[in-house]
Amino acid sequence: MNSIQCRILVFLVLLTSCFSPVCGKDKKPRQAIEKLSIDGPYLLKADDGSMRAISVDGKGRLLDKHYKSIPTTFSFEVFSDNGERLFPVTIHSVSRPKWKDVQPEKTFVLSDPHANWSCFASLLKAGKVIDADYNWIFGANQLVIIGDVFDRGVDVLPIYWLIYKLEKEAEDAGGKVTFLIGNHETMVLGNDLRYTKKKYTQLADTLGMTYPELWQKSELGHWLKTRNSIQVVGDNLFVHAGLSKEFLDRNYDIPTVNEIVSDGLFLTKKERNADKGSDLSFMFATYGRSGIGVWYVAQISIIR
């Protein structure tokens, strides 16, 4: 190597050493892959009778099991976000409940649990609706939950699965569990995720689908699509946030309202408003112009 080549090589080494720290400082670090949080299970049923069970365990591992057919007594365990084993659930048949019930001796009513597992479970235990193991002990009485399980908290699935489980246990005991659609059900399933915790959208992203798509294909999604928005129990009418004068002026019957809301549950805001004059658009109108009134109500706990 001659002297000219040597000087050029030294110059390049010095040039590299001078610029490397600057480039490294300006370059954005590669974002680390975040561990998934405990969630699920989401049971995705296919038309051919097969099923896919998706969940995340306590170590953040994605569990994705496929079943060629669904066993008649298929059951699974439900865990809270902090890893506590809560209760087992057995799948049962799902259909739309009647919109009108006879008044039982007692009716326990609450609303807006917003994925707060400890609060929701504590209320039901204090009201003698469930025992320490989350089993139905309310006899032939009725539990009414007026919507809004989604958003704000981290235990959406445990609350929905408990309601689903209690529905069958109450029926077997001569009682009833009623879950009504609230505005946060319509928001999340319509892909308005502004109040949805990151753990849920992160799981959907990992699976290559949107969060509403994950629900639409699931057992709980099918169950939600068959829930009513208005329910009459004896002389009491229950709805998430009241009924507007405009709604009353339209003289809808309750079964029609329940069907319209269910039909639009998994549609986006744009799809719901495609025909501005339609019943569908009216039912999903926002606060201040609301037809059915599925917006804004505080959590309550009432025993009648």
Regions found by a protein language model. Name each.
Residues M1-K27:
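Bacterial Sec-dependent N-terminal signal peptides
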Residues C23-R304:
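Feature recognizes metal-dependent phosphohydrolase scaffolds
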